[in-house]
Amino acid sequence: MKRVIIAAFKQETSTFNPSPTTRDQFETVIGDDIFSLINSNSEIGGALKVFEAASVTVVPTYATWAVSGGPITQNDLKLISEKLLQSIFDAGEADGVLIVFHGAMAGESEFDPEGRVLETIRN
């Protein structure tokens, strides 16, 4: 049976928005609580249904998301990224990793945090 790690780090940043996004604005579910999203209208909800139908073993790790806002403060971006990455590394070996990103996230001084997270996982 295939084993897939699932995680999320999702926020759409508008660099024109002067109000920074902080970790307090993120909703977070960790570990098995991610399974509570199966009936949500979300990427994770859809993925959980597909994986269940395909008899894929899902390893839930860390999922966090916020509404659109200004750049994420660097300290909070670092903290959230570290929690996400540690949860993925702690999950052990897997056949794949599914990470839900928005694709337009930015920190106060980091313009591609999603790319950095992916690069860290690959290496």
Regions from the PLM with identified roles:
Residues M1-A54:
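N-terminal amphipathic/basic leader segments beginning at the initiator methionine
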Residues I5, K10-E12, F16-P18, F26-E27, ...:
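Active-site histidine-anchored catalytic micro-motif
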Residues S19-F35, V56-G70, P113-V117:
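Charged, low-complexity, helix/coiled-coil-prone segments
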Residues K49, A54-S68, N75-D76, I80-L85:
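Low-complexity, highly charged intrinsically disordered N-terminal segments
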